[in-house]
């Protein structure tokens, strides 16, 4: 039976029921709905709506229902209820009779679902924090393992300057830490309890909403009933935080896909996270990484969806908000599996050091070192930049690295070049000179890893 049938004389269209019912989506809020209902039973008992005995009976029945559904989750969808709130109330009435009809006194589905959803976000958010921390740990472990593995760094996907694989890992540690900061910050803002806000104007019963919030482990109650039932900022923020994090996961996936390619060959991926071709026996495809990259667009789509749904809604609750959950649930599911998969990829990754080093030695990645050398001899940097550019063109024509020039050939570009130029052009020198906070020098990478391990 619908929770709102008294006002209506005609039958609901089967098509409308299919269109209107949200149980196929919001069944995931079952546990939160029961927990919220238990707290609400205490709240209405505190203002004399039900007796202590009735409160105890309601809470016992709700806890029994919780156990039953956990044992057989299929009974929710088999019920044909309109939504998760209707399912819980109907199941409760089946257990305790008319007493179950008292539970909704002073409560609306508007503040009920707002509370359920915030409880769900808090629970799932905590799990996502743990996943981000696991990925961070995997990156730090990989950075420590491969801190001195030399590889080319890129700009515009062109070889630019040599870096280490450890330094590359630490770049993504920084991104993951920002994701963690954003997520924990968003969860703090979502840590307020809407229950007691009623449909929009507040409940008519003078209960202690601070106690109600505390019972549900919220930091505090919300302060405006109109905002409480119509606020979905926590949904938007969770989707936004996920989207930004998925940018980072997608970029990492793209880097690793390239590093794993035959053209680069810097890394090898574990068989655990790769698959083959139905036609080409030699293929070992980085499917896990490609799916991370692919799911990023899916997460973005859900963010745009909730932003668009909420953009022009008048206060307070509107049925449009029923569309908040499907996208949110999919975002959280997608983000969670991508975080888990990224961690698994990293745990089995092997760096092919000779290939990565060879690539770093090619492409004139030491050109900046030659320019810096000329500056150390007194040449203005802009002039040095031009001279080295000319030298690179000549080296390309001769098919030699910069260090392949004889001293006499070097002097045709600048008389101030001496024999001491050659030690400055080695990979080791290129790395060692970047001995500044945040740089790729081995000393800096070691210090950065040590600092990250302490946190």
UniProtKB/Swiss-Prot annotation:
Pathway: Amino-acid biosynthesis; L-arginine biosynthesis; L-arginine from L-ornithine and carbamoyl phosphate: step 3/3. PROSITE patterns: FUMARATE_LYASES. Pfam families: ASL_C2, Lyase_1. Keywords: Amino-acid biosynthesis, Arginine biosynthesis, Cytoplasm, Lyase. It is found in: Cytoplasm. It is an enzyme of class 4 (lyase). Its EC number is 4.3.2.1. One of its GO terms (cellular component) is cytosol. Its main location: cytoplasm. One of its GO terms (biological process) is L-arginine biosynthetic process. Disulfide bonds: none annotated. The keyword Ribosomal protein does not apply. It catalyses: 2-(N(omega)-L-arginino)succinate = fumarate + L-arginine. One of its GO terms (molecular function) is argininosuccinate lyase activity. Belongs to the lyase 1 family. Argininosuccinate lyase subfamily. This is Argininosuccinate lyase. The gene is argH.
């Amino acid at each position: 039976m619908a929770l709102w049938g008294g006002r209506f004389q005609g039958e609901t269209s089967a098509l409308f029921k299919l269109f209107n019912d949200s149980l196929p989506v919001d069944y995931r809020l079952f546990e939160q709905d029961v927990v919220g209902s238990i707290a609400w039973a205490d709240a209405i008992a505190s203002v004399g709506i039900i007796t202590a005995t009735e409160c105890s009976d309601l809470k016992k029945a709700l806890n029994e229902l919780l156990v039953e559904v956990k044992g057989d989750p299929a009974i929710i969808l088999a019920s044909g209820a309109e939504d998760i709130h209707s399912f819980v109330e109907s199941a409760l009435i089946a257990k305790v009779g008319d007493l179950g009809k008292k539970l909704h006194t002073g409560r609306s589905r508007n503040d009920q679902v707002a509370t359920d959803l915030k409880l769900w976000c808090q629970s799932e958010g905590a799990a996502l924090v743990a996943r981000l921390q696991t990925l961070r740990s995997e990156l730090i472990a990989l950075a420590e393992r491969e801190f001195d593995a030399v590889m080319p760094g890129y700009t515009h996907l062109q070889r630019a300057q040599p870096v280490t694989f450890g330094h590359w890992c630490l770049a993504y540690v920084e991104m993951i830490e920002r994701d963690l900061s954003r997520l924990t910050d968003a969860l703090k803002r979502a840590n307020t309890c809407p229950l007691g806000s009623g449909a929009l104007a507040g409940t008519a019963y003078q209960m202690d909403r601070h106690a109600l919030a505390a019972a549900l482990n919220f930091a505090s109650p919300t302060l405006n009933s109109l905002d409480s039932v119509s606020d979905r900022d926590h949904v938007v923020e969770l989707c936004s935080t996920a989207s930004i994090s998925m940018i980072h996961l997608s970029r990492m996936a793209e880097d690793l896909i390239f590093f794993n390619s035959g053209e680069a060959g810097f890394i090898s991926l574990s068989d655990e996270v790769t698959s083959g071709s139905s036609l080409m026996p030699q293929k070992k495809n980085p499917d896990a990484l490609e799916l991370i990259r692919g799911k990023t667009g899916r997460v973005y789509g859900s963010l745009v969806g909730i932003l668009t749904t909420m953009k022009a809604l008048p206060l307070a609750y509107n049925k449009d908000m029923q569309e908040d959950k499907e996208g949110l649930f999919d975002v959280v599911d997608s983000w969670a599996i991508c975080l888990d998969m990224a961690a698994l990829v990293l745990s089995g990754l092997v760096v092919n050091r000779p290939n990565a080093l060879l690539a770093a030695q090619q492409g004139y990645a030491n050109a900046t070192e030659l320019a810096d050398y000329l500056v150390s001899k007194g040449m203005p940097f802009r002039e040095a930049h031009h001279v080295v550019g000319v030298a690179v063109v000549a080296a390309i024509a001769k098919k030699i690295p910069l260090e392949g020039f004889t001293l006499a050939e070097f002097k045709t570009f600048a008389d101030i070049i001496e024999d001491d130029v050659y030690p400055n052009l080695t990979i080791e020198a290129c790395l060692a000179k970047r001995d500044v906070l945040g740089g790729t020098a081995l000393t800096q990478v070691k210090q950065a890893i040590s600092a990250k391990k302490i946190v």
